[in-house]
Amino acid sequence: MAVIKIKPTSPGQRGAVKISRDHLYKGEAFAGLLEPQFQKAGRNNNGHITTRHKGGGHKHHYRVVDFRRNKDAIPAKVERIEYDPNRTAHIALVCYADGERRYIIAPRNLEVGATIVSGSEAPIRVGNTLPIRNIPVGSTIHCIELKPGAGAQIARSAGTSATLLAREGVYAQVRMRSGEVRKIHIECRATIGEVANEEHSLRQLGKAGVKRWMGIRPTVRGVAMNPIDHPHGGGEGRTGEGRHAVDPWGNLTKGYRTRNNKRTQVMIVSRRKK
């Protein structure tokens, strides 16, 4: 992959930095794994805004990605690597020996034509999925389950990975990209390697319109609103908040802890590093 610096032919192009997709498949996505995706624009069934700053954006189909990788002991051949508009990672179309095709998250260095396999007897090779109890300590892994059989939930974004630190009894300790160390059941599955498209973080959008293509609407500052719309609103001329920073509903926003101490708190060995 390469980083593409755009010629400054306009203000929007001047700061834009794109990631090359020359190595990706150029054709249409596999129709058997596409589903319609209806845009809600952040509204619920009453038409009320439940998530701000959403709306518009380019239409696209949802690619059904296999996060469970539960087709054990059946080898699959990588047919192509594709762009997925629904996520930062690339996806790979694999064809199993019995003819079934599935999309998976594409790991780094996975080549077209490579063979991957899932199951407890799978070799330790990039793209293979195994229970954590069968993965050597110190391995780099991604697409990690939190509950056995529930499907991957951790380390699915572009360039992300985690490290298997230790195994104690029925739990393993895994260090996340954030620095958090968490206990995960050894029967949970994980995939060897790290997620591809690691240069995604170098991308520069260049102009506000790119955000609109993504379905993200502008975020207006509270001090620029009227007092009926935000606690920071109102005043003559340019004024500050006049109080501690709050959200539109009056809740503190700076230095205020929002995480609930859920029952899964006991699974965190070490909190994430700031």
Curated annotation (Swiss-Prot):
GO terms for cellular component: large ribosomal subunit. Signal peptide: none annotated. Residues 224-256 are annotated as: Disordered. The keyword Hydrolase does not apply. SMART domains: Ribosomal_L2, Ribosomal_L2_C. Keywords: Ribonucleoprotein, Ribosomal protein, RNA-binding, rRNA-binding. GO terms for biological process: cytoplasmic translation. Pfam families: Ribosomal_L2 (PF00181), Ribosomal_L2_C (PF03947). GO terms for molecular function: rRNA binding; structural constituent of ribosome; transferase activity. NCBIfam families: rplB_bact (TIGR01171). One of the primary rRNA binding proteins. Required for association of the 30S and 50S subunits to form the 70S ribosome, for tRNA binding and peptide bond formation. It has been suggested to have peptidyltransferase activity; this is somewhat controversial. Makes several contacts with the 16S rRNA in the 70S ribosome. Part of the 50S ribosomal subunit. Forms a bridge to the 30S subunit in the 70S ribosome. Belongs to the universal ribosomal protein uL2 family. This is Large ribosomal subunit protein uL2. It comes from Acidovorax sp. (strain JS42). The gene is rplB.
